[in-house]
Amino acid sequence: MEAEPLETEQDEWRKERMRVLDEWCEIELKGADALKMDVTREPGSPTVAVAPETSLQDLYPLLIATSSSNAPPSATPTDDVTDPEVQVVSRESIDNRSTFNRIIDVCLCRPVKSQMGPKAYTDKTLILKLAQIPYDHENGTHWLLLSDYFNNVSRSLMTSSEYSHVTNPSRVGAHWVTVGFQSATPHTDFRGCGVLGLLQMHTFTQRVPANLLRAIVLLATTEPNDFPLAVVSINITSILLTQLKKGALDNFGNEIEGLYPFFSALHASAMCRFCSIYKSQKCTLANTQTIFSEITRQLEKSPLSLIMLLNPTNDELINTLL
């Protein structure tokens, strides 16, 4: 005698329920490790825009070193991830519901927000810390990044034969205004984002292709619609920091690259978006806040769509900037 359809459905439901409970038990045992996944890239999408680079955990000790200590601090960055000055919710407290309620969510197929993995969480913490560290004249790494930014921007408009005539800039002078700062003392512009603003500014000049960087620098320095490129970069870093503090970027980190590569790629993409709008709409300095608001809206809607601007197959930047 064949089983009744209702009994068959009940058996299938019981099996499915046991499977879900078994999976949840594994998650309970392994913790965040069971929830690891690469959410930096969409399945099947090009991944060139998010390239591997120097680990933020390697850069951090160099960026926080002070004049009184030439050697990096002995403590590792991860030792400080619970620093109360950094207002980040710890991974363990992200989901403080009872085990029963979480099992119910799984059984009912309710969407559950995945926790940040240790590497992504550490990157987020260090990014927020760097935003609080002021530029230090005595820190060799700070000066190296700043002078290299100057050279990258200056050389973008030169021919290869002119490179040899470029020398390291003096620390104070009108030449800093030509690369996008507000005054002859560039360090004063970093007050809003600390050395994170400097790091992102430098990374931007290395991340974008040479022909694109040349077009952007040319746009920023051509009167009468010129704009301070460095200041725009710092403002975009500030916008990204706001999104980071809100938790809007938490799901874009992974345990291979962490969160920092995505953060810096997003900064470069937002810079390109700013320049694309600025040129295509024939904007002036009076329109910059409107453009920043538009970039913020796009970040809130879909960070991935913004980051795809740097995809080599995307013609938008070629059509507007080149």
From Swiss-Prot:
Transmembrane segments annotated in the record for this chain: none
ELMO domain location: 141-303
Residue ranges of coiled coil: none
Classification via Pfam families: ELMO_CED12
InterPro entries, alphabetized: ELMO_dom (IPR006816), ELMO_domain-containing (IPR050868)
UniProt protein name: ELMO domain-containing protein C56G7.3
